[in-house]
Amino acid sequence: HQTNLYRLSINLRKAWMEARDLLPDILREHFPMPPILVKALCNKMNLYKKISHCWNKLIILDSSKNAREAVELHQRWPSRVKVVLLTRDGRGVYLSRRSSGRSQSESVSGWLKYYQRALPLLERYIAPDSLIKIRYEDLASEPERMGHLLCNFVGICFEPQMLDLSSISRHLVNGNDTRFSPGKGIHLDERWRTKLLGAELEFFQRTGGSMNSLLGYR
């Protein structure tokens, strides 16, 4: 059960970190992370080490989407942490959420706020050779080419069997329903091109069009 004091401490740390993100670099170093968050980062790296040892793997892929955490991990272990930013055309995201019954504003706000926070942080604090941007559309339509690109990014050789997720043991926590369909794979979904029309498309363009352009979509 969360007490009021516990919730207050979380909100204060969140406000501190958000304010810290806005500071110039010369000031940011004088506003350190709260010790409890530093401990959490160290715990995560220790977990990576344990997984690497137990599974005998050199590379651990963490599909977490916390951009601030990615920045802090990279800054503390720059030679060991690389970041992949996977994007999707916001029009596809918007249509998917609208189809699930969300309002217009709900369907664009989460996607928009995430990239409004993530893009400046990643581009400002992640070394260029440690950050790669991958489009879902490219991954779904050209998986082998993108596989080569990702492998080059982390310094390993691409092997075609990497694309067959059903050929290996996986341990998934949370996620969507594809975790129960190992043979389903990734398929390009661009229904928005034919189904997102009129007022709906106009709303997205008005609210999320600029961000979509920043992500490289036209």
Please give the residue ranges for each predicted region.
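PAPS-dependent sulfotransferases, especially Golgi type II membrane carbohydrate sulfotransferases
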Residues: 23-32, 36-39, 98, 119, ...
